[in-house]
């Protein structure tokens, strides 16, 4: 009985007969045919194929599209810095933002502490 069951599992056919010869076991092959999702590059919006796929900060890029926003040098996963969804080489990131001492100001945005100061002023005028 174990030999017949093992033989039934080893045969690629869809039907296998048991040891008595009159019982039939139905077998079906199940294939996982998942539709492949087309991934698009965050930089150029074109299809990214698995061989050229690179993921940085949960965004998908072509290897050739993953470059510094300032100098357009090709980046690697170990040689980039990201801020607000923009990618930079480490030298330009330091040059552009470290000199200011405040990353938000370097990006031309309001300082985070200024946003809180406006809320305190607004709440102070309402209670007074």
Swiss-Prot record:
Q: Kindly list the positions at which N-acetylmethionine occurs in this protein.
A: 1
One Pfam family matching this protein? LIM
| Top-rank lineage group of the source organism | Eukaryota
GO molecular function term, any single one: metal ion binding
Give UniProt keywords alphabetically: Acetylation, Cytoplasm, LIM domain, Metal-binding, Nucleus, Zinc
| UniProt cross-references to InterPro entries, sorted A to Z | LIM_LIMD2, Znf_LIM
Keyword Transport part of the UniProt annotation: no
Record domain LIM zinc-binding: where:
39-99
Q: Which residues bind Zn(2+) 2?
A: 68, 71, 89, 92
User: Among the entry's GO cellular component annotations, what is one?
Assistant: plasma membrane
Summarize where Zn(2+) 1 binds, as residue positions: 41, 44, 62, 65
Q: Which GO BP terms apply?
A: actin filament bundle assembly
Renumbered to this chain, region (Disordered) spans: 1-25
Q: Where in the cell is it found?
A: Cytoplasm; Nucleus
What function does the entry list? Acts as an activator of the protein-kinase ILK, thereby regulating cell motility.
Q: How does it assemble?
A: Interacts with ILK.
What is the name attached to this protein's record? LIM domain-containing protein 2
What is the source species? Answer: Rattus norvegicus (Rat)
Q: Source organism lineage?
A: Eukaryota, Metazoa, Chordata, Craniata, Vertebrata
């Amino acid at each position: 009985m174990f030999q017949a069951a093992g033989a039934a599992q080893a045969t690629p056919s869809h039907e296998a007969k048991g040891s008595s010869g009159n019982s039939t076991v139905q077998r079906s092959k199940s294939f996982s045919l998942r539709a492949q999702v087309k991934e698009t590059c965050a930089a150029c919006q074109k299809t990214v194929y698995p061989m050229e796929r690179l993921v940085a900060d949960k965004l998908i890029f072509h290897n050739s599209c993953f470059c510094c926003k300032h100098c357009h040098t090709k980046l690697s996963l170990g040689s980039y810095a990201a801020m607000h969804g923009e990618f930079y080489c480490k030298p330009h990131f330091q040059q552009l933002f470290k000199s200011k001492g405040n990353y938000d100001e370097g990006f031309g945005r309001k300082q985070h502490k200024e946003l809180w100061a406006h809320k305190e002023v607004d709440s102070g005028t309402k209670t007074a």
